[in-house]
């Protein structure tokens, strides 16, 4: 595997262990050229999944887009990157469980919001404000009321 430091193709595995609830293998590698250590992950290749965007176009599912969105929503919140990665895993697993080849971006957004609501209220509201494209304060207030109603039920 290519070293991210010196770009030589000479590395060796120095540690290997299950990761992501046994859905991946985490490998710690060391470059034989420069000694730089880095981590790689091995995951099962899954069948392609297409996302139907709001304008009707389709694109390949990209978990990194979801991760980026939740990272932005969780900025300066007490949420670890591991928690965000787990959230994205839950969303992706939920999508895959449905056995579909295509899913709308709206459905993905709803799954993300459901997961965020269980993780952090502020991150949920931040994500909702972009995902739902609030036009004014009333849309924001509706999201806040939804969150408060959820807490009242608990």
From Swiss-Prot:
Record family assignment: Belongs to the NrdR family.
Under the GO molecular function aspect, what terms does this record hold? ATP binding; DNA binding; zinc ion binding
Q: Where are the zinc fingers (unnamed)?
A: 3-34
User: Record's PANTHER family?
Assistant: TRANSCRIPTIONAL REPRESSOR NRDR
Q: Does the keyword DNA damage apply?
A: no
Q: Where is this region: Disordered?
A: 1-22
Q: Which residues form a coiled coil?
A: none
* Designated name of the protein: Transcriptional repressor NrdR
Entry-linked Pfam families: ATP-cone, Zn_ribbon_NrdR
Task: Tell me how the cofactor is bound.
Answer: Binds 1 zinc ion.
Q: Where is the ATP-cone domain?
A: 49-139
Q: Which InterPro entries does the annotation name?
A: ATP-cone_dom (IPR005144), NrdR-like_N (IPR055173), RNR_NrdR-like (IPR003796)
Q: Which organism is it from?
A: Lactobacillus gasseri (strain ATCC 33323 / DSM 20243 / BCRC 14619 / CIP 102991 / JCM 1131 / KCTC 3163 / NCIMB 11718 / NCTC 13722 / AM63)
Q: Which GO terms describe its biological process?
A: negative regulation of DNA-templated transcription
Function comment: Negatively regulates transcription of bacterial ribonucleotide reductase nrd genes and operons by binding to NrdR-boxes.
Protein keywords: ATP-binding, DNA-binding, Metal-binding, Nucleotide-binding, Repressor, Transcription, Transcription regulation, Zinc, Zinc-finger
Q: Tell me the cofactors it needs.
A: Zn(2+)
